[in-house]
Amino acid sequence: MLILNNEEETKKLAKLLAQSLKPNDIVLLNGDLGAGKTFFCREIIKHFCGENTNIISPTFNLLQTYKTSNFTIYHYDLYRLKSPEEIYELGFEEALNGNLILIEWSEIIKHLLTPPLIEVNLEVLDENKRLCSIITNSSESSLIDFLQASPLFSTKLDIQRDKSPTRKIEL
């Protein structure tokens, strides 16, 4: 696991992860209120859409979309979702067709999702510090290899490689 000491380190990690993302990836962000899920998503969106992109939290409308030249980013916040079926009213089937999906508070629909999934877990340690882990159930090792090769965090990476479909990346 990686301790992110401040927002700058969180930005760096989000941008690093964004470099490995591609259409059809689904990223689940977990953590308590104020853990930094939306902040993390904003940095991923900025990577694809530009630093000056006006990024609005989907907390009240549950969904915000952002167009890139090749695909759309669907940013969901499911905190207020009452039932799993409501996700389909938010264009989820369309989102699954060649787009990047970011989901905050995904627990309510996780059973509907099929691999590969990338989970980013953020835990508040204090006002500025977060504990972060990334888990993927992808059979491909491209994400693991990419993060492991990064000069930004490579000295802190402890990658668990096993034959199970779930691979935990402890930063």
Curated annotation (Swiss-Prot):
Keywords: ATP-binding, Cytoplasm, Magnesium, Metal-binding, Nucleotide-binding, tRNA processing. The keyword Glycosyltransferase does not apply. GO terms for biological process: tRNA threonylcarbamoyladenosine modification. ATP binds at E7, G34, A35, G36, K37, T38, F39, E127. Its main location: cytoplasm. Pfam families: TsaE. It comes from the Bacteria. Gene3D superfamilies: P-loop containing nucleotide triphosphate hydrolases (3.40.50.300). GO terms for cellular component: cytoplasm. One of its GO terms (molecular function) is ATP binding. SUPFAM superfamilies: P-loop containing nucleoside triphosphate hydrolases (SSF52540). Mg(2+) binds at T38, E104. It is found in: Cytoplasm. Required for the formation of a threonylcarbamoyl group on adenosine at position 37 (t(6)A37) in tRNAs that read codons beginning with adenine. Is involved in the transfer of the threonylcarbamoyl moiety of threonylcarbamoyl-AMP (TC-AMP) to the N6 group of A37, together with TsaD and TsaB. TsaE seems to play an indirect role in the t(6)A biosynthesis pathway, possibly in regulating the core enzymatic function of TsaD. PANTHER family: TRNA THREONYLCARBAMOYLADENOSINE BIOSYNTHESIS PROTEIN TSAE. Belongs to the TsaE family. This is tRNA threonylcarbamoyladenosine biosynthesis protein TsaE. It comes from Rickettsia felis (strain ATCC VR-1525 / URRWXCal2). The gene is tsaE.
